[in-house]
Amino acid sequence: MLKRWILTLFVVCLGFSQVAKAELELVITEGIDSARPIGIVPFKWHGEGKLPQDISAIISSDLQRSGKFSPIPTNKMPQTPYKDSDINYEAWTKMGVDAIVTGEVKLNAQGKYEVTYKLIDVVRGQLTKGQSKALDESGKLVLTRDHILVNKVASLSTKQLRKYAHRISDVVYEKLTGERGAFLTRIAYVVVNDKAQYPYQLRIADYDGYNERLVLKSKQPIMSPAWSPDGKKLAYVSFENRKSQIFIMNIYTGKRELIASYPRHNGAPRFSHDGDKLAIVLSKSGSLQIYVVDLKTKKMSQITRGRANNTEPFWAPDNKSLIFTSDRGGKPQIYRVNLGDGSTKRLTWQGSQNLGGQITPDGKYIVMVNRSETGFNLAKQDLETGAVQVLTKTLLDESPSIAPNGGMVIYSSIYRKQNVLSMVSIDGRFKARLPATNGRVRAPAWSPFL
C-alpha cells in the first residue's frame, strides 16, 4: 500500500517546492466608479536600477480589488510628493481624495531595503496646513501632525518586499475602513492538466496568484481543499487509492493524517472555526449524510439522517450549527441544522436550486451558487430578511470561498471553455478573473488570516 502511495502521489513540502512568479494572473473585468478615491503615490527609490517589487503598484492593486477604493492613476495625480512638506493638500481634495500613501525606499548599511511609508489625511492636512498643535502631558503646546495617520519604517530582504507591500495594504485598509484587510492571505486550489504526468495538483498561492507553490500532485483526482483555522493544514479528498479518502496535511512538513476511508463516498471536509472538529460527508449507509469528527478523540457523530442527500457542510461562526445542501425538497436547497438539538430549517427559497453555501464571518449573509433562468451564478442572501442579490454574470459558477474579512469571494467559473478562478466583492460591484496558464483551475479555498 505504502509503495503504491509513493508511486502515485508526491507530497511536496512548501520550503522546497518550485515557486512561480504568477501562475494565476489577475485581470480586472469590472471596476467601481463610485469607490473611494485614494492616492497611492509611487514610492521614491534611492538606488540604482529598478526595485525588485513595485510596492506602490501592489498596494494600489490590493485596494482596488477590495472594491472599496479607486486608486488615482499616476498620470492623473496632481503631484507625486515624497515628503509631507511637499504635499499640496488642496490639489488632492479637489479630486475628491481624502487620503494618500507616500513612501521611500533605500538600501541601508546591512544591504537591506529600508521602506518608509506614511498614510496621510489630506482633508485634515488642508484644514490645519499640516501644523496642528495640542498640549502634551506637561501642558506644553506641541506640533501633533495628526493628519499623518500612519508613519512606519521597516528593514526588509528582497523576498520580503512583496509581502510587506500587502502588509501596508492591510494597514491602510483597516485604518480607513475600520475593518481588517485580507491581503496577506493565501488561496488553495486544484489545477487539472490532462496532458501532465500528474494531472491533478493541489497548489497554494498568495491571494492575488503570486508565489504559487505546489503542495501535492497525483495521477488520481484531488478535490475539496479546506483550510484549518491556523492556516497550517489543509483537509482534502484524494482518490489516490482508487477510492475517495479524506486526509489532513500539514502544508509545511507534508505530514498527512487519514481521517476517513469508508465504503463508497468520503467527501466535503470542513474545519470548525476553532479547529477542533471536521465536518465530512459519507455515504456508507446509503445516501449522502453529514458527520462531525472530533479531531482529538476521533469520535464521529452523525448529524443528518433520512433518504435525502445532504452535503457541502459549512460551520456557522459560533460553531453551534451547520448550513448544508440537501435535496430533501426535490432539488438542492440550503438548510441549517442546530448541532445541539438537531432541529433543521430551510434557508433558501429564491431560485430553482441553491448550493455550495458559506456564511460570512459576521454571520449576516450566505454566499451560494444560485440557479435561475440565466444559469448558475453566485448570490448573496441576507439571513435576517431573506433578500437575495445575484453577484455575478459569469458562466457555471461553483465553489465559492469567502475571504476571512468577508469583503471578497473567490470562486470557479468558465471562461473560454476553461475552468478559471474569479473574484467578486461581497457587494457585487468589483469583479476580476485569475486565468491559469497551465490547466483548469477548480475548488478554490481562501485561507484564514495568517
UniProtKB/Swiss-Prot annotation:
InterPro entries: 6-blade_b-propeller_TolB-like (IPR011042), PD40 (IPR011659), Tol-Pal_TolB (IPR014167), TolB_N (IPR007195). Gene3D superfamilies: TolB, C-terminal domain, TolB, N-terminal domain. It is found in: Periplasm. Pfam families: PD40, TolB_N. SUPFAM superfamilies: TolB, N-terminal domain, Tricorn protease N-terminal domain. Keywords: Cell cycle, Cell division, Periplasm, Signal. One of its GO terms (cellular component) is periplasmic space. Part of the Tol-Pal system, which plays a role in outer membrane invagination during cell division and is important for maintaining outer membrane integrity. Belongs to the TolB family. The Tol-Pal system is composed of five core proteins: the inner membrane proteins TolA, TolQ and TolR, the periplasmic protein TolB and the outer membrane protein Pal. They form a network linking the inner and outer membranes and the peptidoglycan layer. HAMAP family: TolB. This is Tol-Pal system protein TolB.
